[in-house]
Amino acid sequence: MSSTVTATDVLRDAYGRIRDALPGLIGRLDDRTLLWRPDRDANSIGWLAWHLTRVQDDHVAGVGRVQQVWTREGFHDRFGLPYEVENIGYGQTSAEVGAFNVTDVDLLVGYHDSVHTMTMRVLDELEAASADGGSDGDSGYARVVDAHWDPPVTVAVRLVSVIGDAQAHLGQIGYLRGMAQRR
């Protein structure tokens, strides 16, 4: 076994921690707690779990140039939300957040599990492309995925950004859970 730790190893670990944390945070919560909002403009636990998974699905699928799990595996239909298929929750109004009504923890966790599996596949492909040296200039972690920023956003930056976003939302879920259980 090699003692070398690669960027892919670190990313796998970070995404694995997200995957491991979510069920423990939302499991066994009742419907009321999943949808509770501390005020009319706040996000609910259920919405945050959905949103962090939608962002990971959207961004990692984009990096991997694959179809999102949301549509490929029919989660858009299973969730039955009143949002456009491409909606990931970013910039939603308070009314749109309030329209989130999913209380099926197994569905939320199952969607995240499927996104995690896709994420691991994309990381495997990126590792192979990086090992190849990215000789075509369009593969691996250095590939630019969004040139609208200065500096342009690379695959590596996008993947780390998704991790940071998900970790922030997991913290919000934990905080909301504590608040909801004390009301």
Predicted regions and their residues:
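Extreme N-terminal tail/first-helix region
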Residues: 1-14
